[in-house]
Every structure is written in C-alpha cells, then in structure tokens.
Amino acid sequence: MPRGLELLIAQTILQGFDAQYGRFLEVTSGAQQRFEQADWHAVQQAMKNRIHLYDHHVGLVVEQLRCITNGQSTDAAFLLRVKEHYTRLLPDYPRFEIAESFFNSVYCRLFDHRSLTPERLFIFSSQPERRFRTIPRPLAKDFHPDHGWESLLMRVISDLPLRLRWQNKSRDIHYIVRHLTETLGTDNLAESHLQVANELFYRNKAAWLVGKLITPSGTLPFLLPIHQTDDGELFIDTCLTTTAEASIVFGFARSYFMVYAPLPAALVEWLREILPGKTTAELYMAIGCQKHAKTESYREYLVYLQGCNEQFIEAPGIRGMVMLVFTLPGFDRVFKVIKDRFAPQKEMSAAHVRACYQLVKEHDRVGRMADTQEFENFVLEKRHISPALMELLLQEAAEKITDLGEQIVIRHLYIERRMVPLNIWLEQVEGQQLRDAIEEYGNAIRQLAAANIFPGDMLFKNFGVTRHGRVVFYDYDEICYMTEVNFRDIPLPRYPEDELASEPWYSVSPGDVFPEEFRHWLCADPRIGPLFEEMHADLFRADYWRALQNRIREGHVEDVYAYRRRQRFSVRFV
C-alpha cells in the first residue's frame, strides 16, 4: 500500500461518520413537525429510519474503502497507522466519542468481526474521560421565580417552540405549582429555581420538557410530558420530580427519544445529574445513539470483569427452549445465545429468532420490551466460565463456539438488561406486592397489544421485573404483529365426549390463538387466579383482542404513558 493512503482512509471514515450524524440530526429535527401535525405513523417510520442510518452509512464507507484499496488486503502495521491518523483527527472533533464507535463498526464490517483488539479498535476511548469541547451555546436556560412560580412557568411554556394552541395554559400551570408545593413545601419552593433544556425530547405522541429543579437541598428532575387533545390543542399531562420517575421515563424498555443533540456527550453529561442511576451506555441509548451505547455497554462490562472474581453461570430461571442465557452473579446484564437446536415444539429457525429481535429493536417498545445489544465473535476467557456453564455451552451451542485454547469465541450473542424472572418474583411475594405484579403483567400485555405486538408465549417465565417493579417482556422468539394473529373463540363441543378427548374437536390453523386457553396456565396458582380474574379477565376473551386489532387496522395509535394513570393531572386534580 502506498504511504499516505492511511490518512486518506482515516479521513474517509470520519467524513462518513459526519454524513451519518448529519442525517441523524436531519431526521431528528423533523420531530417537532411530526408532533404538531399529529402524524403518528410518520413518527414510527422516522424512528425506524433513524435506527437504520448507522449501518447504512457504515456500509457506504466500507464500499469506499474497498475502492480506495482496490480490494487488496491490508497488514497489521498499515491498520495501526490508519488508527493513529484517525486518533489525531479527534481532539478538535465535537463528536469524538461516537466517531470512535463508527471507526470500530467500519473495521468490524471490513474484517468480519475478527481480530478485535485494543490496538486495532477503540475498545476504550483515546480521549480523556468526560472531555468536552467548547459549547457554542448553553444546553439549558435558567429560570428564577422573581415574580412567583406562576410567572416563571408562564415564561418557560411561552419559550417553547411549539406552534399549536394551548387548551388551558393557566390550568396546567396551576396544576404544576400545586404539585411542586405538595412535593417541596411553600418555603423550599420559594428558594428553588428551574434549569430547562433548550431542546424538547420527542417520543411516541408526546413532547417532553426536560429540566432540573434546583432546590436548597439538591437537584431534582423536572419533567413535563406535553400531549395533544383530539382537537390539536396542547396540554401538560403531569409533572414528574423524582429520580425514580425520571429513570422510568428514560428506561431501557422504551423507544429512543428524538432530541436534537449536535453535541451528544455534553447532553449526556447534563442529564447525568437527574438520572444518577443510569450508566453512560443507558444515557446514550435514551437519546438514540444506540451504536455508541453498545460501545459504552461493552466498556462497562470490561470494567466490571476486571474488578471482580466471579465466573459466568447459567442465569436463574427456567431454562429456555431457544436461548441459552448466562450472567455474572453481580452484573446487571445477561448474555443470550441462540441454541444450535430448539425444543421440538419450537418450529422456527435461528434466522427467525434474529428477525424477531430486530423487530423489537425497531418497534415502539412502549416501556414493556427490553432493548438488546447484538455482538458477533464475542471472546470469553475460559477462566471466567464456570465448569457447569462451559459444559452447557458445548452441549447447547457448540456450533457457535470456537475454542482458542485459553479463550472461546461465541459467534453471535445478545446482551440485555438483567431482571428478576416474573415466575420467580411471584413465588417470593405476597399481599400488595403480588397484586401489583399481576396488575403490571396484565398492563404489559395490554400495552404491547395496543402497540401491535403479540408476545406469543405469555408464560410468566418470559417476563422480568425491573428494579422499579415494572414488568417487562424479554423472550422474543414467538413475537409477531397483532394483525397477523387470528383470535378465535373455542367452538362449543358437539358431544359431551368432545371435552374428554385428547385432541380438540375443532380445526386449528397456523396463526390461530384461543384466548380462553390463557386461563389454564395464567390462573393455575390459587394465589394468582382470583387476582387475574378480577383485574384482567377480558384478556381471556377473543372479542377483546379482535377489538384491538380493529383499532390498529383503522390506523389508531394508542397513547403511551411512562407513569401511572393516577399521576395524570386529569385523574389527580379533577
């Protein structure tokens, strides 16, 4: 290879990333118009399009590089020089951290995810931790209650870029002040002020005002979800001011926000104060930088691994028929490998399973489906793997494992947030906790269905409980669109003997689902059955599911709330 080509390649990769992030910002900047026009289907399509941008632009750069090098192979020394040139381009670059991830992605695409070493890739960043460039304009604006909180909030809301009429701005401000007074007390509120992000955070059918409530005793989140009435008038649905509430809003089971962030590192750092429980990976994920979030997630894993003496073990819970799941006992993630062969009742391919996981990545997860990061050629040290797990890996996924002596390479796996399996949770709780869990499970099913997702396998073992007590679906191999399912009532038996027969007396076609049958496995536990019948009996009726299908086919997009119904102003104060 001629000298000087290394710099050209480095510049080509960075220019490719510039193009990708420019398109990312372009799609994001359309969020306000889509919201104001109430074009909810365009909102969903824009979300999918933005997710696809990254891989598309990686592919474009890879093709450019193959042309530049005439398809010739490159030796290790050449690649090291490319990375050195690329690193020199980053100190004055405003999005250096994601540019490093883009470099990694191009490298992995070129070399089929082989030789993934710190010398060749930005396994860890080349730049000082939390280093930021000069910000051309502040990310947020401060508001002080010099003339009272009503006046302050009127200024905040009047500063918003939204062009629609408000249904009743004074009413909403009154509700916010009432909430703040009840939360802080009159004296504390008088000594507090707001810092509000300049950009709105758009997701689903809401525009979120995100701010910080700075009080004498500390900083709290200040979140206002702005919705539209059927007449296209704006209203504020609630006010959230606890870190737990903010954590759920920015949760790993929700779709990514559309927020205009030309300097994502600065925005992540600004958010960190009101989301102290979120990792760097989770914050980047929340603002839509999912590929860099994958980089940060892998770094968090490496840091944890370096500081612990644990071994990987099979994850707690009932062993899956499609996925082999393992974890580190103290780590908050699980690792999921598609088995070589599935249980006989699972009539599907590995390609189908991967397609299901991609569907979840692109779909509106409505706070009820865990996000995943997908990895290829994932290296594990054998000394970190328990003997029992090693035996299980070789038994269930040998075709996906390469033995390198001291290490193994797993060809493909997913990393996902670790939760307590719902079936285990239900065994451990009683009273109100049990009731809350059953209510949450039913709500999860309803919200998934309203978002055009049918879980397929609805057993409790396929759901998990988060640290906030939310129930989240995480087993996707049988997932499908609601509109693909034929929900049927079980026909009446022709003769008394029909009910005693081992085979059904009616025909069953692929795609047929009989909701009456859900009762057999969801209500078998005498502690659970009565609660389920009380709160979710309609889930056992085919007409309930068919009515949802009709709404979906008519183009209706349901509202998705990242908080309890009782927190809505329309419920709380009316």
Curated annotation (Swiss-Prot):
The keyword Transit peptide is assigned to this record: no
Subcellular location(s) per record: Cytoplasm
Origin superkingdom: Bacteria
Enzymatic reactions: L-seryl-[isocitrate dehydrogenase] + ATP = O-phospho-L-seryl-[isocitrate dehydrogenase] + ADP + H(+)
The protein's Enzyme Commission number: 2.7.11.5, 3.1.3.-
Binding sites annotated in the UniProt record for ATP: 315-321, 336
Active site annotation, chain numbering: 371
Pfam families referenced in this protein's UniProt entry, alphabetically: AceK_kinase, AceK_regulatory
GO biological process terms, semicolon-separated: glucose metabolic process; glyoxylate cycle; tricarboxylic acid cycle
Gene Ontology terms, MF aspect: [isocitrate dehydrogenase (NADP+)] kinase activity; AMP binding; ATP binding; phosphoprotein phosphatase activity; protein serine/threonine kinase activity
Alphabetical keyword list: ATP-binding, Cytoplasm, Glyoxylate bypass, Hydrolase, Kinase, Nucleotide-binding, Protein phosphatase, Serine/threonine-protein kinase, Transferase, Tricarboxylic acid cycle
InterPro entries linked to this entry: AceK_kinase (IPR046855), AceK_regulatory (IPR046854), Isocitrate_DH_AceK (IPR010452)
GO cellular component, one term: cytoplasm
HAMAP family the UniProt entry points to: AceK (MF_00747)
Function summary: Bifunctional enzyme which can phosphorylate or dephosphorylate isocitrate dehydrogenase (IDH) on a specific serine residue. This is a regulatory mechanism which enables bacteria to bypass the Krebs cycle via the glyoxylate shunt in response to the source of carbon. When bacteria are grown on glucose, IDH is fully active and unphosphorylated, but when grown on acetate or ethanol, the activity of IDH declines drastically concomitant with its phosphorylation.
Family classification: Belongs to the AceK family.
Name used for this protein in its record: Isocitrate dehydrogenase kinase/phosphatase
